[in-house]
Regions:
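Active-site anion/phosphate-binding pocket segments in diverse small-molecule metabolic enzymes
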Residues: 2-13, 17, 67-68, 86, ...
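Active-site-proximal beta-alpha core segment in soluble small-molecule metabolic enzymes
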Residues: 3, 7-10, 18, 25, ...
């Protein structure tokens, strides 16, 4: 990450703490919180966000990759869990650093078990169950139960928990996810009966499940997008009290009047109809400012919306600043956030891009400095 650039994001860690507490408030007192801080905490900064979540009462930190887990293990002693697949080449690292992993494949589990026994340790693992996401996990049929039973009884693996993931919890119709919950609980019950081994921590509910499905809170909840201040979707039956944590700002690189008839940017997709004050913003698609915002998006300045003109470039884009005639180079604009009662929010940007909030914030690249406030 660069030490200074004329574009940066500000992360309000107090808002992260507030959102983590809001997630925790949905669940019963004895339910654990696994804060999902994968993908650099959805672009917000994994180390800083993790500390804020721990301050707010989180019990576990959830990541997607070995590298993410090791980054956090260098700072924190709390349980850190990799939610996805851990390659065999990383087994030594996860054993040495006490990283919890997801297990679901017997052949891979046997290799992990052998590595753990060789090191004289037990790996703490959570059994991943595929209840309908069709991505990773043991199936809930007889063959899946046999595989899970074999894993649970391996000496070098302590199966602390079992988990799955809802595929439609953010939709208004909860029929499918109710089926997932029923399949999950039945499978884990059968596994315990077959092996005589207790699965201490069941977890299934991410942000949408936390808000709309209290019956899915089980032993641990996994807040993700709600930690960063956003509702999982507009179809939710309930609304959480959340505060967005991210603001994206920039200082203008050039402000100049260009004559009518001038075309702007690559391929000249925008032609000035009159003499226009054009301001150049030093951020582009290499920073995560999506090229699909070309000739569609806007930035904020002094309570006004300045529309993007021309295509978003790799490092810059241009806006029509005619409404602010005294604007000058070095003045500040807001790419995401609020200014004098006017806003451009992550959900609004997601709608413009026909995507979800998660992608908007995850796409903000590491060359954009994060400043914590």
């Amino acid at each position: 990450m660069e030490a200074y650039r004329p574009t940066w994001v500000e992360i309000n860690l107090k808002n992260i703490e507030h959102n983590c507490k809001a997630a925790k408030a949905f669940a019963k007192e004895n339910v654990k919180v696994g804060a999902v801080v994968k993908a650099n905490a959805y672009g917000h900064g994994a180390v800083e966000v993790s500390q804020a979540c721990l301050n707010a009462g989180a019990d576990y930190l959830m990541v997607a990759t070995v590298g993410e887990a090791l980054e956090l293990r260098g700072r924190f002693e709390v349980p850190i869990m990799i939610l996805g697949w851990t390659p065999e080449e990383s087994y030594d690292q996860i054993i040495a650093n006490d990283i919890r992993v997801a297990v679901y494949d017997v052949e891979e589990a046997e290799k992990l078990n052998a590595k753990a026994l060789q090191a004289g340790k037990q790996v703490i693992a959570h059994l991943k169950v595929d209840t309908g996401m069709s991505r990773l996990g043991v199936q809930t049929d007889a063959a899946g139960l046999e595989a899970a039973a074999a894993i649970v009884q391996m000496e070098g693996i302590e199966v602390e928990g079992a988990f799955s993931h809802f595929s439609k919890a953010d939709e208004a119709d909860k029929t499918f996810v109710h089926g997932q919950l029923e399949r999950f609980n039945r499978f884990v019950d059968e596994l315990q009966d077959r092996t005589g081994k207790k699965i201490a921590i069941r977890h299934l509910g991410a942000s949408a499940g936390i808000i709309d499905l209290p019956e899915a809170h089980l032993d641990m909840i996994r807040p993700g997008i709600m930690l960063y201040g956003y509702q999982p979707s507009t179809e939710m039956h309930h609304v959480a009290d959340l505060k967005p944590a991210l603001t994206w700002k920039a200082r203008l690189g050039r402000v100049t009047v260009l004559p009518a008839g001038r075309v702007i940017g690559y391929n000249g997709t925008y032609e000035l109809k009159q003499d226009t004050l054009v301001a150049t913003v030093p951020a582009g698609y290499a920073d995560g400012y999506n090229r699909l915002l070309s000739n569609r998006g806007y930035v904020l300045c002094r309570g006004k919306k300045l529309p993007i003109i021309g295509k978003v470039c790799m490092d810059y884009f241009m806006v029509d600043a005619t409404e602010i005639p005294d604007l000058k180079a070095g003045d500040e604009v807001i790419l995401i956030g609020e200014d004098q009662g006017v806003s451009i929010t992550v959900p609004e940007m997601a709608v413009m891009l026909k995507t979800i909030e998660h992608e908007v914030t995850c796409d903000i690249s590491l060359r954009v400095p994060r400043i914590y406030v």
